[in-house]
Amino acid sequence: MALAKQHDIVVLEDAAHAFGGEYKHRKLGTIGDFGSFSFHEVKNITSFGEGGILCSNVTEFLPEMRRARFLGTDFSKHIPNWLYDVTAIRGKNGPFVATNFSTTEIQGLGLQLQIARIDQIIEARRRASEYLTKRLSACDALIPQDLGNDEIKPTFHLYQLQIIPEKAGGDIQLFKKKMDAKGVTQIPHFGPLYKFEILREYGYDEKAIAESCPVCEEVFNHRFTHFPVYGLTPEQLDYMADAILESVDEMQRGV
């Protein structure tokens, strides 16, 4: 943040998967000028479908943020008989019409109840991740999930596993095929942004960007994958750990 302020840069903190996490004793999503959380159905806690929260440390934007939530309506003023006014939101490039980002009361209630359980939910995820890390740490061809420390408290949205191709006898693509054959779900969807078709349509040169990002290419194409762990039984976690170790063993033996 100090570097951003030095260069007058606004920091937008994407904390979509990180509700309840901490960095240096500060809650994730509250460090930047703006922070956003997602409560889509695949996140750690949900609002029964879509939903999110936008936070800000920039007080002058708060009135605009509140009005942007629902058609530019100022709910601090009395609205008789639902005869509300649609006002413009003042943006950098001029006024624009707000859309409807409001949610239902049922969704709001469901989210509130889950927020009250966030520590319990994260702890369950942490225990599952801790078990896998303990099982997998004995294999020198694997880099298990980092479990954090006193200054870094993850939310364990997914279990991130990296392999070392030189030691594993193959890269992550071969590993994924073996895990698929064993019926273990993987979620490797965090791809480099420059690989999205929309950026090609905007005229970005995917090949040129890829050549300038060799580490990103190596990690995505050859080294990492993710596993869902929340709600798995001890027997299912056992099976997952066994499948991972067996797959690496097969790769090393060339079978």
Question: Which positions does each model-derived feature cover?
Answer:
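Catalytic PLP-binding core of fold-type I/II PLP enzymes
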Residues: 1-25, 57
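Proline-centered loop/turn at the N-terminus of a beta-strand
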Residues: 8-10, 27, 34, 185
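Generic structural signal for small/hydrophobic residues in well-ordered secondary structure
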Residues: 14, 35, 39, 52, ...
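Active-site region of PLP-dependent enzymes
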Residues: 18-24, 31-158, 194
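Short amphipathic alpha-helices in soluble, non-transmembrane regions
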Residues: 65, 171-182, 240-245
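Conserved PLP cofactor-binding pocket of PLP-dependent enzymes
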Residues: 71-86, 131-136, 175-215, 219-225, ...
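Conserved PLP-binding active-site segment of the aspartate aminotransferase-like
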Residues: 148-149, 157-168, 186, 195-202, ...
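Generic C-terminal helix-cap and adjacent flexible tail
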Residues: 246-255
